[in-house]
């Protein structure tokens, strides 16, 4: 076992890590392993860095509900192997319909 793996295994932290899959609109899947107590913004930032997109242009959804960056897997009762959807924000339209 490497020193890195030993750091992840602490006595009494049974199941402190969780494996999550982030699936993009294009079907691309990225896998992450984070602590259950880690805020999801860490995962969101890592996903956006890998995809070279701005975090503000992506909506992350779990069970159809939008995720907030400060939430944790524990708060959301996420289980190992759960899937998060990463959807590109739809922007556009007439620009707000300004009136004179």
UniProtKB/Swiss-Prot annotation:
The entry's localization annotation reads: Nucleus; Cytoplasm
Q: Which family does it belong to?
A: Belongs to the ubiquitin family. SUMO subfamily.
Q: Where is this cross-link: Glycyl lysine isopeptide (Gly-Lys) (interchain with K-? in acceptor proteins)?
A: 93
Coiled-coil regions listed in the entry:
none
List the InterPro entries.
Rad60/SUMO-like_dom, Ubiquitin-like_dom, Ubiquitin-like_domsf
GO cellular component labels: cytoplasm; cytosol; nucleus
Q: How does it assemble?
A: Interacts with SAE2, SCE1, SIZ1 and MMS21. Interacts with HSFA2. Covalently attached to ABI5, FLD, GTE3, HSFA2 and ICE1.
Role according to the record: Ubiquitin-like protein which can be covalently attached to target lysines as a monomer. Does not seem to be involved in protein degradation and may function as an antagonist of ubiquitin in the degradation process. Required for the massive protein sumoylation in the nucleus induced by heat shock and controlled by SIZ1. Involved in the regulation of the heat stress transcription factor HSFA2 in acquired thermotolerance.
Which PROSITE patterns does the record match to this protein?
UBIQUITIN_2
Which protein are we looking at?
Small ubiquitin-related modifier 1
Q: Which gene encodes it?
A: SUMO1
């Amino acid at each position: 076992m490497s020193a890195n793996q030993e750091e992840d295994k602490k006595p009494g932290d049974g199941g402190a890590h969780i494996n999550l899959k982030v699936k993009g609109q294009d079907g691309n899947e990225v896998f992450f392993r984070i602590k259950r107590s880690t805020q999801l913004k860490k995962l969101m930032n890592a996903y956006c860095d890998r995809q070279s997109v701005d975090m503000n242009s992506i909506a992350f959804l779990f069970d159809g509900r939008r995720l907030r960056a400060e939430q944790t897997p524990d708060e959301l009762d996420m289980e190992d192997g759960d899937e998060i959807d990463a959807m590109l924000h739809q922007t556009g339209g007439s620009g707000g319909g300004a009136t004179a």
